[in-house]
Regions:
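Rossmann-fold NAD(P)-binding glycine/threonine-rich loop
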Residues: 1-47
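NAD(P)-dependent Rossmann-like dehydrogenase/reductase catalytic/cofactor-binding core
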Residues: 125-215
Length: 215
């Protein structure tokens, strides 16, 4: 509906700032004949939206009309806007399919990281180990990073919940399966998360629930 109303706007950049399946921006641009539509994935967290926006570690802009080696007009216009307001934040331009994949990749990796450290925590419980001491030793390796290693998590529960991680993990599983790529890793992450997690707070979000899931 919004794009129908903006269909005749040919001068200004129209930015889709959301997490959408790979190919969505390209399909919408084709459907509504919008040369000026770009995709900019959202990296905000619900708890710290304002802080995350002002202190972003990167901005990603994707155009459905980008050609390898050629700068596309509208993604460059969007890039200039961000650089003018946030000169110190790096901006990455790419195709819209690539920018859509960036967000899914980041969220699925972090969900996998949460699942991995929950697994280590559970094993430590069985073996009588102190998780925090184990974690301190592991995190001395700078390649690993502290984020998403707390067990239980910030909400006091195990695994991951909310809307983003469950939705994006399941969307990626579907995308992998539709392209005949093994989704075993993410399926294992998801199935284990349902065992670890007490609060299935994603249950009312149809895009975050897989078929035949029951408690």
């Amino acid at each position: 509906e919004c794009l129908e109303k903006l269909q005749h706007n040919r001068e200004q950049v129209i930015m889709l700032k959301s997490t959408v399946p790979v190919g969505t921006t390209k399909n919408l641009a084709k459907k509504f004949n919008l040369k000026n539509l770009v995709h900019c994935p959202e990296f905000l967290t619900a708890a710290n939206a304002k802080h995350d926006f002002v202190n972003a570690d990167r901005t990603v802009i994707g155009s459905p009309y980008r050609i390898e080696g050629v700068e596309e007009t509208y993604s460059e216009m969007a890039k200039e806007l961000f650089k003018r307001v946030f000169p110190d934040i790096p901006v990455y331009t790419m195709t819209s399919c690539e920018s859509e994949m960036v967000k899914y990749t980041a969220n699925c990796f972090l969900a996998t990281k949460v699942g991995f450290f929950n697994m280590i925590f559970m094993l430590g419980e069985k073996l009588g180990l102190n998780y925090n001491r184990v974690l301190a030793g592991v995190l001395s390796d700078p390649r690993i990073g502290k984020s998403h290693t707390a067990v239980p998590g910030p909400d006091g529960d195990y695994g991951f919940g909310g809307t983003c991680f469950p939705k994006d993990v399941n969307a990626m599983i579907t995308t992998l399966q539709n392209n005949h790529i093994s989704s075993y890793i993410l399926e294992s992450v998801w199935n284990d998360n349902m065992k670890y997690r007490t609060n299935w707070d994603w249950a009312n979000n149809t895009s975050a629930v897989r078929a035949n899931e029951t408690r």
